[in-house]
Amino acid sequence: MNGKAQVTMYETAEAKKYKKDFTKYIKEQVKIQQFNIIPNKTQHFYCDCVFYFDRIDKDANNYFKLLLDSITDSQCVWLDDNVVCERVNAIYYDSKNPRIEINIYPVDYIGIFQSQEQLSNFTNNCIHCNRYKEGKCSILNKAKEGRILEEIENGKCIKFKCLKEIQN
């Protein structure tokens, strides 16, 4: 073990069945609700949940993780649950009708940009920079991934160098 703790995840048979059934249900609901999103690595989502458990001793965190894993396994909404902003809005107890109510919707922000408009304005400026070659500016790409960069101050790239053809 090299002096490091080893953790083994264990999924009960009940959890495996829940995950499999829920993955199938997600795929069905995506079609029924016409949730037309092409999964990608940068789009983030809010996942708002209200749990109605049949008894008090249930753990919302475990169910939420299984829920996220099931949605990830479906590959219909997102590719990896690292793009999810998780929000458990309430936990109730309803022995007659246990359920989970889920609302999934895309966030407005894109990376460090608060809106599509802010991203477009930044990108339009980038197009006129020496660093922007066929859309491959590392600063812009990292900013779209949500990385905080020293090169961007107050919404402006401090590494901006105007293309020679525009300067003339």
Model region roles, listed by residue range:
Residues M1-N168:
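Acidic, proline/glycine-enriched N-terminal capping motif
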